[in-house]
Amino acid sequence: MTQHSHVAGGIVLNSRGEVLVTNQGGRSWSLPKGHIDDGESAREAAAREIWEETGVNELVFVRDLGSYDRYRTALDGGDDEGELKTITMFLFTTSQMELGPIDSEMHPEARWVARGEVAALLTHRKDKEFFEQVVPVLPA
C-alpha cells in the first residue's frame, strides 16, 4: 500500500542567478525539500528544510510555484512506490553564498549550480520536469 505524504521545498536563487541544489544521502541530487511538521505551514517547512539541507537561512520569499506529485526516490534513482509525495514549492532569493548543511549525514553537500545545468543534475525525472516548467517564471 502506498503511503501519501506532504512535502515542501524551494528553488533558491542567489545574486548571480544560480540555483541551490542538495545531495540526498550521498546518492541523489534534488532541490531542497522535506516533510512538513505538525503545526507548520508549507512555506515555513520549505524555509526550515532549505536551512537544514544547505545552511542557508537568509531567505526572501518571492512567490508560490505550485505543487507536483512524485514517488520517493529509490536507492537506484528510480521510483519507490511505497511513498507518494505531494511537493509544494516556493521561490526564494538570498544574498547568502556560503553553504553548510546542518544535517550533513543525510545531506552531505549543497552547491550553487548555473540555471542551465540544474535539470541535468537533478536525479528524479519529476523534479527535472517541474524545474523545467518553472524556469520561464524565474527572475533573470
What does each of the following model-derived ranges do?
Residues 3, 28, 110-111:
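A residue-level structural signature of the nucleotidyltransferase/glycosyltransferase Rossmann-like core
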Residues 14-57:
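Conserved Nudix-box catalytic region and its N-terminal flanking loop in Nudix hydrolases
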Residues 55-98:
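Active-site segment of metal-dependent pyrophosphate-handling enzymes
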Residues 89, 93, 100-132:
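NUDIX/MutT-family hydrolases
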Residues 133-138:
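C-terminal alpha-helix
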